[in-house]
Each structure stands twice: as C-alpha cells, then as structure tokens.
C-alpha cells in the first residue's frame, strides 16, 4: 500500500515537473516570438523595409524572383516619365527642343501596350532617353514637389541604358526601389538573434486603414515609418493635406491608442537621404511655419524628431525609440534593425519575467 502511494506521489511529482517544464518552455517560446506591425502613411517606406528583411535575413531575391520584377521596373520607369510630361503641361514649362512634344505624344501612344506586355521595346526606350536628356524635363524634375512623382523616378531614368538592355535582370537595389501600392496585409517571417519574427506590412493609404484593426492584438512592437522628405508634399489621396501633418496625425492616434499601452513604439524617420538633399532648397517652414532654426540637415531633422516625440502623452511610462533611416540602404537598415532587435529582446524577456 505504502509502495503504491509513493509511486503515485512520484508520478504526480513527475507530472508536476513536466507541467512546469512545459510552462517554462512555452514562456521562453513566447518570448522568442515577435509580432511586428509596420505602420505609417502611404509611401513612407514600409514595403522597402520588408524587402530589406528578405535581403538581410533570407538570402535576398533569387535570379528568378528578380526577373519577375522586370515588368514592375519598366512600369515604374514609364509611369515616372509620363508624370513628368504631364507636369510640363500643368506647370506651363517648355521643352528645350520642340520635337520632344512629338516624342511625348508617341510615348503616351506606346506606353499602355508596353505595360500590358510587361516589356520595354527599343523604340520606347529611345524616346524616353531623348526626353530625359531634355533640359526642360530636367527643370520640371527640380519642381517635383508640385506634382506626384515616385521617389525612384530619377534612379531608374538615369540608368535607362542598363535597364533597356534585352538581357536586363533587375539587381537587389532595383527591386528595393520598385513601387507597388500595398493593398491589404503582407506578412513576412524570418529568424534573427534566435527570435522568430512575423512582420506585417499594412497598406498606408487612407482607404486601407480600416483593414489594420485585426492585426493589433498581441503585437510586440510597432515600427512607425515617416517619410521625412515628404514635409513639402501633399497626399496623393487628398491634395489639401500636407504629408508630414498626415503622418503626425496618424502617429498621434497610434502612439496614444489604448491598444498599445504595453507595445514598444519604434519610430523610423525615413528617407533621410532625400530629406538631406531637399532641405537645402525647400524650407521646413512649408510644413512648420513656426520653425525658426536654420535649414540644415541636423537642425531640421532634430526639430522633426521633437515634433513626433512630443505627441507621446505618456512620456513617464512610454518611451519612443527613434531612428533615422534610409530604407533603400541595406547597411543602414541592418544596423538599425540590430538595435531595434536588442530593445525587443530586452522588453520581451522583461514581459515574460525572464529578465
């Protein structure tokens, strides 16, 4: 009898140990699962960050995958030159050479068919090269804040010689620069520093925002992207609204949301390279009339950082982790994401009582 009781006690103790072990393992496993939500207004660089995760943590894009982006590169290139041509008319600008008017008409006739086929015929490529070389077009490019133009426009158009070759295969950088509007939610999985990441890229345009809500539950951290270079631009979907003001409004609603009281907020002040180029000739007062500092990169970026961080209504209990980023620069993103991961590890272990 006594022997039976001791065997039962031993079995119960073993079961208890096993339950404790499983709970501990579950706790550690939970601490290693990271759900990241990428938020931000349209065209703030969220999808580029996702592509960088593939390049940095998943061996990048294979040759076959790169080939699949060829049609997107062609489309982005053609759409960019068309946007500049349309702006020439709106801004009442003249071409340097009158024959470019004819080229522009031919381009518009050929563009739709080429886009449907997903190619860039030699004749069309030559027309684009001639237009791009025109000083009128180049002048129109300097006034890009007055119309909607992809950030990658000059990147592709400057490299037409390479892009228009029959055997062209997009590089990793070409893929990074492609612009396709994100609709719905794009999920990416990868492992880094023994953590299992699930990253959700959510459509940034206003029409997409109602789809975000079910992503919110159990989020470890939010990476909020802001296009710093958009301080002098208006929204594609609302030409009355300054893009930076829209970003601030959205950040305010995310940062102070009751859903996110326990969530780490990481702020990526992105497109720092474009911002640095732009601030020298386009004053910050366009966006912030009260700004009295110099239009230099350091002072202007610090001012924008303060404007966003000041929106945090719970400064005593909630920290905003701010980084200046260039989403198309793999080394920069790698460095920043390394720092972000360390913050996540620390906060995650703390939440699970393991730190």
UniProtKB/Swiss-Prot annotation:
Q: Where does it localize?
A: Cytoplasm; Cytoplasm, Cytoskeleton, Microtubule organizing center, Centrosome; Cell membrane
Q: Tell me the superkingdom of the source.
A: Eukaryota
Region G3 motif: start-end pairs: 197-206
Q: Which residues bind GTP?
A: 40-47, 176-182, 201-205, 270-273, 327
| Main localization of the protein described in the UniProt heading | cytoplasm
GO CC term (a single one): midbody
Report residue spans for region: G2 motif. Answer: 174-182
Q: Which stretches does the entry tag as region G4 motif?
A: 266-273
Is the Membrane keyword given for this protein? yes
Q: Name one GO molecular function term.
A: GTP binding
Q: Lipid moiety-binding region for S-palmitoyl cysteine?
A: 3
Q: Which segments constitute the G-alpha domain?
A: 32-355
Signal sequence coordinates = none
Q: Region G1 motif: which residues? A: 35-48
Q: Which PROSITE patterns match?
A: G_ALPHA (PS51882)
Against InterPro entries, the record matches this protein to: Gprotein_alpha_I, Gprotein_alpha_su, GproteinA_insert, P-loop_NTPase
N-myristoyl glycine lipid modification positions? 2
Q: Which GO terms describe its biological process?
A: adenylate cyclase-inhibiting G protein-coupled receptor signaling pathway; cell division; G protein-coupled adenosine receptor signaling pathway; gamma-aminobutyric acid signaling pathway
Region: G5 motif, residue numbers:
325-330
Residues that, per the record, bind Mg(2+)? 47, 182
Q: Does the keyword Nucleotide-binding apply?
A: yes
Q: How does it assemble?
A: G proteins are composed of 3 units; alpha, beta and gamma. The alpha chain contains the guanine nucleotide binding site.
Briefly state the protein's biological role: Guanine nucleotide-binding proteins (G proteins) are involved as modulators or transducers in various transmembrane signaling systems. The G(i) proteins are involved in hormonal regulation of adenylate cyclase: they inhibit the cyclase in response to beta-adrenergic stimuli. May play a role in cell division.
Q: Which PANTHER family match?
A: GTP-BINDING PROTEIN ALPHA SUBUNIT, GUANINE NUCLEOTIDE-BINDING PROTEIN G(I) SUBUNIT ALPHA-2
The name of this protein is Guanine nucleotide-binding protein G(i) subunit alpha-2
């Amino acid at each position: 009898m006594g022997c039976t009781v001791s065997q039962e006690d031993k079995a119960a103790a073993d079961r208890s140990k096993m339950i404790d072990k499983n709970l501990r393992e579950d706790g550690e496993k939970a601490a290693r699962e990271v759900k990241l939500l990428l938020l931000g207004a349209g065209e703030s660089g969220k999808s580029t960050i996702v592509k960088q995760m593939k390049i940095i943590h998943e061996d990048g894009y294979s040759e076959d995958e790169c080939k699949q982006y060829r049609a997107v590169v062609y489309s982005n290139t053609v759409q960019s030159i068309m946007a500049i041509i349309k702006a020439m008319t709106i801004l009442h600008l003249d071409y340097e050479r009158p024959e470019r008017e004819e080229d522009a008409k031919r381009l518009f006739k050929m563009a739709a068919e080429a886009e449907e086929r997903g190619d860039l015929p030699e004749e069309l490529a030559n027309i684009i090269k001639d237009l791009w070389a025109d000083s009128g077009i180049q002048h129109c490019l300097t006034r890009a804040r007055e119309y909607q133009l992809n950030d990658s426009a000059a990147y592709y158009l400057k490299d037409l010689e390479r892009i228009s070759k029959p055997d062209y295969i997009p590089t990793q950088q070409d893929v990074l620069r492609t612009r396709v509007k994100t609709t719905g939610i794009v999920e990416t999985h990868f492992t880094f520093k023994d953590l299992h990441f699930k990253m959700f890229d959510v459509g940034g345009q206003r029409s997409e925002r109602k789809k975000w809500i079910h992503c919110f539950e159990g989020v470890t951290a939010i990476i909020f992207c802001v296009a710093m270079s958009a301080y002098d631009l208006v929204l594609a979907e609302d030409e009355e609204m300054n893009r930076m003001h829209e970003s601030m409004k959205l950040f305010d609603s995310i940062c102070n949301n009751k859903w996110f009281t326990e969530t780490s907020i990481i702020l990526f002040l992105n497109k720092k390279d474009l911002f640095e180029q732009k601030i020298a000739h386009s004053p910050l007062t366009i966006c912030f009339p009260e700004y009295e500092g110099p239009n230099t990169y350091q002072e202007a970026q610090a001012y924008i950082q303060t404007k966003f961080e000041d929106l945090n209504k719970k400064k005593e209990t909630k920290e905003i982790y701010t980084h200046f980023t260039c989403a198309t620069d793999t080394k920069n993103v790698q460095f920043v994401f390394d720092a972000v991961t360390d913050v996540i590890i620390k906060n995650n272990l703390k939440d699970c009582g393991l730190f």
